């Protein structure tokens, strides 16, 4: 009896603070009963359920795209892609946690136990228009249909801890640096950004790296997105040219799968001539001339540790050991040879291994890339200085982030790396994701292919002009 009185007193105090009508009752027991009935009624009547203003509305449920599966389908021979995610397994609880990751799971589960979560189902009318149903209670494990909305009490924001999560400080750019980074953008759509990366700018941070594309993208290249662009493939620090960034997590998953499946497919099943697949072309200036005008290099690579474990390098695996060996395939074509011992090559990597093009050129073709001192040091020591007949003074301009964007051509004492990611063809990911939002089984027979071409960096363009002029001079003589 004492416990009941204590509970009654506690409930009376709570209701007095929340309900102004409690003081109008002379009989406390009747007051408690009326207030309790009023509280229960607010969650049970249709009229209150249809008052959308008192609820926190989550986005309508949409199919989850399995980016990995989509990437595999794109590189297959079929004309459709499927989202392999089984939407019937997406429960109300899972959708709430996905839309509101800031809400503690225990709080969301408590809302379900208190029957304070509502569902508004979407129903098709004549196959075209969508009609909304009344709000109804939903259980945590109930599966959602496409278009369903979940409603939560507005009080959840008050019950959520207000301590903001620790955020990683973004790289701070000056106006001049921001303008420079934005000038690298060649293409932008809702799914991807394509950059023309300059020589000397690292793609990802690490030991001894002050500035990277990864940091700069988060600071300067968000544009209208709340998410930072994500890396989906790599270029060496000294390699220039086309670099693709994903603007959303879904686009990143699809692109990761495309780059990965391209390598896996070429290694295991040979080259697939699929018009929707990824295609990449590089341009390189090498020392010497390959024995043939064109060909395909298929040489496995492995990593070796040198300098007492202080560094590592990639080398062709000649001894047939399969341990830590990665198959690598490169197609090459001679563009033009110079009488001074240099050759312009077009390189097509069919797999994406670390330092693949540099090692294949140096160790398989015997023609290291100009400026590649890691894999072509001996060739550079024996290289005869290229003396230009033209007066090409080196500009001493100030470049952002300490980049050396002047000089470095073939006439320099230490030329920059002459390897440039010049062309990329890839499926239109933005168009694909739009199709997938409409249907999880999408026809991609008419999917567009995006083609990008990056102009040569200044040091390679100058080398091209110098060698071209020397060839013309020799022809005249």
Swiss-Prot record:
Compartments reported by the entry: Mitochondrion
Protein keywords: Isomerase, Mitochondrion, RNA-binding, Transit peptide
Region (Disordered): 34-55
Enzyme superclass (EC): isomerase
Family annotation (InterPro entries): PsdUridine_synth_cat_dom_sf, PsdUridine_synth_RsuA/RluA, RluA_PseudoU_synthase
Keyword Repressor: no
Catalytic residues (UniProt): 236
Pfam families documented for this protein: PseudoU_synth_2 (PF00849)
Entry's Gene Ontology molecular function annotations: pseudouridine synthase activity; RNA binding
Keyword Mitochondrion carried by entry: yes
Main location: mitochondrion
GO CC entries: mitochondrion
Family, per entry: Belongs to the pseudouridine synthase RluA family.
Protein name: RNA pseudouridine synthase 4, mitochondrial
Source organism of the structure: Arabidopsis thaliana (Mouse-ear cress)
């Amino acid at each position: 009896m004492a416990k009941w009185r204590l509970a009654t007193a506690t409930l009376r105090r709570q209701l007095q603070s929340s309900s102004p009508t409690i003081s109008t009752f002379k009989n406390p027991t009747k007051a408690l009963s009326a207030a309790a009935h009023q509280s229960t009624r607010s969650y049970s009547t249709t009229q209150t359920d249809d008052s959308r203003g008192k609820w926190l509305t989550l986005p309508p449920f949409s199919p989850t795209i399995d980016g990995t599966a989509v990437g595999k389908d794109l590189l297959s021979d079929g004309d459709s892609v499927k989202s392999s995610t089984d939407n019937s397994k997406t429960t109300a609880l899972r959708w709430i946690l996905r839309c509101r990751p800031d809400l503690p799971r225990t709080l969301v589960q408590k809302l379900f136990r208190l029957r304070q979560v509502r569902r508004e189902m979407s129903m098709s009318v004549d196959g075209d228009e969508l009609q909304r149903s009344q709000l109804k209670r939903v259980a945590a494990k109930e599966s959602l249909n496409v278009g369903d909305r979940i409603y939560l009490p507005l009080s959840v924001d008050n019950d959520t801890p207000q301590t903001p999560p620790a955020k990683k400080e973004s790289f701070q750019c000056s106006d001049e640096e921001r303008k420079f980074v934005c000038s690298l953008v060649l293409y932008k759509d809702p799914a991807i950004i394509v950059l023309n990366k300059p020589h000397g700018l690292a793609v990802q941070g690490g030991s001894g790296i002050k500035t990277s594309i990864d940091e700069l993208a988060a600071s300067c290249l968000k544009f209208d997105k709340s998410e930072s662009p994500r890396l989906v493939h790599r270029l060496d620090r000294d390699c220039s040219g086309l670099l693709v960034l994903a603007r959303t997590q879904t686009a990143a998953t699809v692109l990761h799968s495309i780059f990965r499946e391209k390598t896996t497919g070429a290694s295991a099943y040979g080259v697939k001539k699929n018009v929707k697949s990824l295609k990449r072309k590089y341009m390189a200036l090498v020392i010497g001339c390959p024995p043939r005008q064109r060909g395909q290099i298929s040489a496995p690579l492995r990593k070796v540790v040198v300098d007492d474990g202080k560094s590592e390098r990639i080398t062709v695996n000649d001894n047939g050991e399969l341990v830590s060996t990665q198959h690598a395939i490169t197609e090459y074509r001679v563009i033009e040879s110079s009488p001074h011992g240099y050759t312009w090559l077009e390189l097509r990597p069919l797999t994406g291994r670390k330092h693949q093009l540099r090692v294949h050129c140096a160790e398989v073709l015997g023609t290291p890339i100009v400026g590649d001192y890691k894999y072509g040091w001996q060739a550079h020591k024996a290289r005869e200085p290229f003396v230009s007949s033209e007066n090409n003074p080196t500009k001493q301009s100030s470049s952002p982030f300490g980049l050396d964007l002047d000089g470095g051509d073939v006439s320099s004492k230490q030329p920059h790396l002459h390897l440039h990611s010049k062309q990329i063809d890839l499926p239109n990911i933005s168009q694909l994701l739009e199709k997938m939002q409409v249907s999880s089984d999408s026809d991609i027979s008419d999917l567009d292919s995006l083609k990008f071409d990056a102009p040569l960096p200044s040091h390679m363009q100058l080398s091209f002009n110098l060698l071209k002029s020397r060839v013309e001079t020799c022809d005249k003589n």
